[in-house]
């Protein structure tokens, strides 16, 4: 079963978010996985804290991490995720790989 994420009153499949949204991982890691074995993820921010009135993710000024956005939906569904994304030695990559591994193979 694929994790469902509640967004604006409706539940959306995790792989649909990968396919259609370009979201900062820190915004939805807590809802997608519930917890993480990686210590860096403990500093995650809830999605509501990142969203402004225009629903655009807003990071606090004191955030030092260089956060990147990825849209892996089509690539993941074709089993053709770019190597530089999966091999990038950062906690965002580890979260990404963890989330993809936690999703059911049928959904991807």
Curated annotation (Swiss-Prot):
It is found in: Cytoplasm; Mitochondrion. It comes from Homo sapiens (Human). GO terms for cellular component: cytosol; mitochondrion. The keyword Ion transport does not apply. This is BH3-like motif-containing cell death inducer. The keyword Mitochondrion applies. Ubiquitously expressed. A motif (BH3-like) lies at residues 5-12. Changing residue 5 to E: Fails to induce apoptosis. Its main location: cytoplasm. Keywords: Apoptosis, Cytoplasm, Mitochondrion. One of its GO terms (biological process) is positive regulation of apoptotic process. Signal peptide: none annotated. Functions as a proapoptotic molecule through the caspase-dependent mitochondrial pathway of cell death.
């Amino acid at each position: 079963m694929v994790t469902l994420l509640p967004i604006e009153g409706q539940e959306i499949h995790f792989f649909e978010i990968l396919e259609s949204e370009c979201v900062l991982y820190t915004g939805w890691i807590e809802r997608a996985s519930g917890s993480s074995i990686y210590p860096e993820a403990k500093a995650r921010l809830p999605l509501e804290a990142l969203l402004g009135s225009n629903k655009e993710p807003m990071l606090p000024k004191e955030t030092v991490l260089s956060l990147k956005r990825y849209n892996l939906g089509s690539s993941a569904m074709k089993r053709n995720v770019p190597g530089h994304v999966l091999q990038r030695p950062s906690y965002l990559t580890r979260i990404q790989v963890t989330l993809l591994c936690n999703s059911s193979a049928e959904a991807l």
